[in-house]
A protein has these predicted regions:
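Charged, alpha-helix-forming regions
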Residues: 1-161
Length: 161
């Protein structure tokens, strides 16, 4: 089931949230990550996950390698296709640590904390969809829990162990 939603943050606001964390990504990987984020915000499509333990509405897009090259404004070459595959791997397998020592209050001001909050996660959850010849047809891409929290209308439920 697909629904359409309105995000409370636009792409530029999300991009600035990521820039604050100074992610250890090369410029090409960042360009690809931002192209995907921009498409998630632009598409406003969500997939209903009724049995989800986190949130039932997960933004999801389906992109082929060619789509990602176009969105990232990269030439359609074998080298750039390989670059996209490597970036998708890095964004969906490697874990990044986000550390906070301040929190943003409702009035927009910041408050310094007496402690640090560290969050480690991937950026995207990515599933490869293959055609009948066993070639990748497209990727189903969903933001991770951390990225969902950046959208601000999402809340993520964590299990208490």
């Amino acid at each position: 089931m697909q629904l359409e939603i309105e995000f409370k943050k636009d792409f530029e606001q999300l991009k600035s949230e990521f820039e604050r964390h100074n992610l250890d990504l090369n410029e090409d990987y960042k360009k690809i990550m931002y192209a995907i984020l921009k498409e998630i915000v632009k598409s406003r499509k969500v997939r209903l996950k009724l049995n989800s333990t986190k949130t039932p509405f997960i933004p999801q897009i389906q992109l082929s390698i060619e789509d990602i090259l176009r969105l990232a404004e990269l030439d359609n070459t074998k080298e750039n296709e390989k670059l996209v595959r490597h970036a998708l791997f890095a964004l969906s397998v490697y874990h990044y640590q986000f550390i906070y020592d301040t929190i943003k209050l409702d009035d927009g001001s910041y408050k310094e904390l007496n402690y640090y909050i560290a969050y480690t996660c991937v950026i995207f959850y990515i599933k490869k969809i293959y055609d009948e010849d066993n070639n990748i047809k497209y990727y189903e891409i969903e933001p991770s829990a951390y990225v969902l929290e950046l959208f601000k209308e999402y809340f993520v439920v964590y299990q208490n162990h």
